[in-house]
Amino acid sequence: MDNNTKKKIAAFLISVGLVTGVSNYEGFRDTAYVPVPGDKITIGGGFTTREDGSPVQFGDKITRNESDIRLTKDLYSYRVKIGQCIKVSVSEGQANAFTSLSFNIGTGAFCNSTLVKKLNQYDYQGACQEILRWNLFQGKPLKGLTIRRQGEYKQCLS
C-alpha cells in the first residue's frame, strides 16, 4: 500500500472518529424532543433544523441511518466553514475538536470567538483552553456540555 492510499484511509478513519465522537456527545432520538428546558426542539444526532432549513417540530421523526448520513454531511460542511476563519495549520485532532465545537455552538459563534483569535496568532494552547469556556447554557454550566468540552479540549491537545 502506497503512502497516498494510507493517508486517504487515515483521513477516512479520522472522519469516522469525528462522526462517532459527535454522535456520542449528541446522543440519538428518533422523535423530536427538547434536550433541556429552554432549548430548541431537537431530533436525531442533535439537529434543530430539518434538511430544508426549517425548524424541527414536535412529531418529526428520523431513522438512525438518516441521522448518521446527515451528521456526516453536516460535519463536513462545518469543517469547510470553520476552515475559512482558521488561518493557521492545525492537527487532525484540533480540526476534529473545533468541528465538534462549531457543530454545537454554530460557525458564526466559533469564527467570532476568542478561540479563533488566539489560534490565528499561533496560540494553540490558548485556543484549546478556550474550548472549556463554552460549557454554559442560559448562563449556567451544564454537566453534559462540561463533559463534552473536556473531551474536545483533550482532543485539541492531541
Description of each model-found segment:
Residues 26, 44-46, 101-103:
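Active-site-proximal beta-strand/loop segments in catalytic clefts of secreted hydrolases
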Residues 1-39, 47-54, 62-73, 79, ...:
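Long, amphipathic alpha-helical surface segments
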Residues 77-109:
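Active-site nucleophile-His-acid catalytic modules used for acyl/amide transfer and hydrolysis
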